[in-house]
């Protein structure tokens, strides 16, 4: 299990962008497709405290928000410990 989890759907272009961002930095992540699994949708609602947009990204157990928040966390050095 990775320290990063990306909640996504198959039709979300920003989800693709977020995953590519993590891939480029060599940061492993688990993807949870909420459009394919009802249980994943329930988990998404709880973990993200009712967020209605994807992607939603969890780092070290804390939901940080979407792609913008991911890039801000990276700029602040908050992802450094996850990079190889």
Language-model segment annotations:
Residues 49-58, 68:
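Structural micro-motif
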Residues 13, 39, 52, 65:
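Short alpha-helical
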